[in-house]
Amino acid sequence: MVRAADTETLAPSQREALKTVLGNRVVVITGGPGVGKTTLVNSILMILRAKGVKCLLCAPTGRAAKRLTETTGLEAKTIHRLLEIDPATGRFSRNESNTLACGLLVVDETSMVDVPLMHSLVRALPNRTGLVLVGDVDQLPSVGPGTVLGDLIESGVVPVVRLTEVFRQAADSHIITNAHRIRRGQMPDMRGADPSSDFHFVERDDPEKIVATLVKLVQERIPERFRLDPIRDVQVLCPMNRGSLGVRELNTALQKVSNPTRPDQPAVERFGWRFQIGDKVIQTENDYDKDVFNGDVGIVERVDSVEQQVAVRFDERLVKYDFGELDEISLAYAITIHKSQGSEFPAVVIPLATQHYMLLQRNLIYTGITRGKRLLVLIGQKKALGIAVRNDRPQRRYSGLLNSLRNDTRKTLA
């Protein structure tokens, strides 16, 4: 059952947005954290379901789909599952000849959807089905080709609802208010941070000191002060994979303190990683046979040297990997900000240094900061943070989508 959303309690900006959505077949809803995207989507679903409209919900990743299920109370699927992918061929069963049976399709985290996947999704929609695309255009674009959400907005061919009002409860969060400052190109407010604040900057200039401070924060200070599990609840997000502050080096350092090697503990070394019971791991590619997807995070539950298998617990599911399949997972004490898209974590820690210079961009830092729910800690150099906040010139992608939208979409959506 959809979560209750009384339209009488909507803010004026949300009520105007609701009229726009209900009056158009295709609509984009965009906005940052705390601006009421979830409330608006729930209102749309409540009204249309009350009228007997069948609504389907989807998102590009498993974790994003799970979050959508939690916030709406309705089942949400990954786009691949919704389109009924055939694991053997990689093709979708749902297409223009076998369309989805729904009157409305809601797509969350649309900024993560690339051009080919969006093309497949639109092909599977019946002609009269409504489409609501929800996302934050200021986040990182998809890993795959194109900038679907940004191009749709820039094209001007579909109505765009821009939610900008940060509501009172969200405005109490320094994570949210500072995320919006960064989105506007302003440095976050770090003056005399209250110890009880949910946003902190710990200044360290030397990379070795950044690592030492980060490890102590993750392993001791954050779990003690905020009563969080250092493995399950605290996530380190890195701008890059390589270097002393990259994913690989930090995973090695964090594994040593979070889940140290024990002689009596079975373990396996494959593809540059050592896996043992209790390790936090991430799926690095879609595996439709196993029903696990790129970005899913789990905990190693069993290492069986006889069967040559590792079992990983992803939420309620136990997934088994042959030793030869362990290139599908890697340690996840630290992951890239790109890999974190579509996910939220109770506590997020982000190292920042000028050695990340080529990747220090506003949308990268903004995306990382908005992953934290209860606590966000930046560790490193203020200069690096300043570079990122000022750098609003991400590499332009030329997929041809924008021109196609401008030329063709008016006729297609008429």
Question: How would you label these PLM feature ranges?
Answer:
Residues 28, 58, 104-108, 237, ...:
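Structural motif
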Residues 137-290, 301:
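Conserved helicase motor core of P-loop NTPases
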Residues 184, 282, 294-414:
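C-terminal accessory regions
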Residues 1-6:
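Conserved adenine-nucleotide phosphate-binding loops and their immediately adjacent elements
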Residues 8-23:
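N-terminal pre-P-loop "Q-motif" helix
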Residues 126, 276-277, 293, 340:
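Residue-level recognition of short, solvent-exposed, well-ordered loop/turn junctions
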Residues 23, 43, 47-53, 59-71, ...:
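Conserved helicase motor core of SF1/SF2 NTP-dependent helicases
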Residues 27-69, 134, 199-206, 218-243, ...:
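Conserved RecA-like ASCE P-loop NTPase motor core of nucleic-acid helicases/translocases
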